[in-house]
């Protein structure tokens, strides 16, 4: 019996654990947002942690009093998080494959300015493989890992690429200094131990190798403006970095930041409108009807609501 099945009858609070700051290790914090456990999906961690999961924040968010990192504490137990990510299907996520290919084509334009040789590239949390598919078409030697086996199978059947099921720490390709580039697209904030992930990235990268991370920036002007209504305040996001804390954790794990920039992503208009439904419930019916009437549902739309892209190099 899975942990999800055994714990199904427990209350949401019974499934939580306290964690220290991942950046400085201290356990001294100020609560930024109080919990809303009454809104939690207590019995469906597979639904909660699917790739298109959009449950608004129910766990308490805290800010470390020593380094300023913001994170969830307490949060769902690590085994629950990993099992939730590993199970289930997500047709909604893969419906946006073409839009994500559009985004990643532009991302690779930037990557190739820093690494024009197009060597070996590893995508962590590769989801359904859109980035790896685009990278392979452009001449990169690709590798990837993804905890959700259904996503791995989808990538194999639709793109013809193999993604290793599991986390970064399950990779069979584990030789030191194996890769020229490692990418984490909307991944680092989901990992239970972000620092451990970055240390493993440093081990796998060649000296001077490139690390690309994009993340929802809690320090962005739109996040500050929207407060608790910011669209990236989600239960699946365990860490909330700003430009200072992302720089600190990268420097602590052997990297030098070369560039920080706003990161635009592309999705279909209808998909974006549906994601906005919890925040604009009064407007969604009108927007939905108009988009259908005008044929806008499938239109690809670039959007920015606080995402930041970091380009860093491994020291040495």
Stretch-by-stretch model annotation:
Residues 22-26, 66:
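Short, cysteine/histidine-rich loop/knuckle motifs that typically chelate Zn2+
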Residues 28-30, 72:
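Short functional micro-motifs and their immediate structural scaffolds
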Residues 13, 17-18, 29, 105-225, ...:
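Conserved SAM-binding loop
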Residues 50-150, 154:
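Extended interfacial segments that mediate partner engagement and assembly in macromolecular machines
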Residues 35-45, 213-239, 244-251, 271-275:
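Short, glycine-/aromatic-enriched active-site segment of Class I SAM-dependent methyltransferases
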Residues 40-43, 83, 154-155, 174-175, ...:
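Short Asp/Glu-rich motifs
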Residues 2-18, 37-57, 258-316:
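A C-terminal cap/extension of S-adenosyl-L-methionine-dependent methyltransferases
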Residues 61, 69-74, 185, 298, ...:
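S-adenosyl-L-methionine
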């Amino acid at each position: 019996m899975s942990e999800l099945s055994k714990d199904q009858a427990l209350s949401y609070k019974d499934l939580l654990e306290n964690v220290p700051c991942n950046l400085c290790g201290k356990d001294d914090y100020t609560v930024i947002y109080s919990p809303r456990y009454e809104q939690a999906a207590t019995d469906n961690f597979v639904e909660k942690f699917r790739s298109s999961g959009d449950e608004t924040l129910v766990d308490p968010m805290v800010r470390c009093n020593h380094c300023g990192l913001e994170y969830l504490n307490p949060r769902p137990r690590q085994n629950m998080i990993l099992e939730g990510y590993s199970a289930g299907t997500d047709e909604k996520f893969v419906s946006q494959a073409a839009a994500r290919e559009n985004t990643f084509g532009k991302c690779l334009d930037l990557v190739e300015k820093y690494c024009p040789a197009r060597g070996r590239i590893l995508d962590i949390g590769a989801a359904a493989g859109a980035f790896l598919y685009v990278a392979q078409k452009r001449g990169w030697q690709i590798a990837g890992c993804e905890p959700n086996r259904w996503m791995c199978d989808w990538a194999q059947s639709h793109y013809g690429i193999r993604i290793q099921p599991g986390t970064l720490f399950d990779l069979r390709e584990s030789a030191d200094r194996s890769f020229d580039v490692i990418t984490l697209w909307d991944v680092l904030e989901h990992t239970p131990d972000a620092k451990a992930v970055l240390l493993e990235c440093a081990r796998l990268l060649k000296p001077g190798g490139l690390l690309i991370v994009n993340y929802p920036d809690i320090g962005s002007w739109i996040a500050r403006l929207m407060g608790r209504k910011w669209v990236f305040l989600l239960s699946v996001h365990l860490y909330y970095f700003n430009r200072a804390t992302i720089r600190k954790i990268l420097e602590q794990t052997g990297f030098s930041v070369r560039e920080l920039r706003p990161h635009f992503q592309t999705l279909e208009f209808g998909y974006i409108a549906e994601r906005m439904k919890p925040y604009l419930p009064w407007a969604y019916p009108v927007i939905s009807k108009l988009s259908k009437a005008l044929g806008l549902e499938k239109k690809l739309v670039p959007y920015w609501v606080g995402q930041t892209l970091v380009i860093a190099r491994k020291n040495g």
